[in-house]
Amino acid sequence: MAEHRSFTDYVRTRFDSNFWAVAEEYLKNNIDDLDLNLYRVHRIGEIELSDVKVECVWVHDLPGMKIQFDVALSIDFLIHEGDYHYDDYDEKKIWIMVRCRGDLAQDLKDFEIYQCCEYNGKNVSKNPMDDALVPVLYPNNLDAEAEAFLRRYHFHKCLLEPCWVQPDELAKAMGLTIRMVNLTKDGSIFGRCYFQECETELYDAESDSMVKETIPARTILVDRQAAFMSNIGRLNNTIIHECVHWDYHQKAFALARLYDKTLSILGVP
């Protein structure tokens, strides 16, 4: 089961060389326009990067598995004296904003920096995600989120008038398969959603042992014993819960897979 991973840490490590390159290019193109307040240097000479740090990352949700993310970079650099009569330098730091995008379905191999500008401390998103790539939901916006969820899977009738959403119909609309199995011997696990095909262990009542079975991706397993011992409402709620889990945590799972390709499920609080 996957633990929550940090997108900021991943970006900081994987794209470090990209950020150094864009920082160097930014200084090259903008050094004359920066308000640097030089104290030792009489004339700007060679610019030497000393450090480039990812200070903060803001992620914006896009359709499918795509994301857009803004990265605040701090750039430490030396400005060497350009007048050969002097031999001195000034140490300076600036912040810039780097706007990036990529597709998690491609493991961000299509990563692109499409804009670089001065950092102004402001960043607003209509579809923010947290550092684990889980959509940020606000209490005063839950109705709108529910409506958007129903629209994504073409349950338009529920938007016209209140109606019950059949769990099996929702799962089918989402391309998910529901199976009743014995997840454990004691029924302690009610349901589980598999994002990726994998081999897992299920309880076999005949042999009274755990047996291995390959579970396809996009499968929801519901524990047969737990379902039998509870009411239909809890069963339906479990299926709906796993469907929502699939929808809202696909990108969090994709991030976890960037750290560990063996993962097939994602644990959430």
Locations of regions flagged by a protein language model:
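Short juxta-domain linker segments that transition from a proline/glycine-rich
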Residues: 1-269
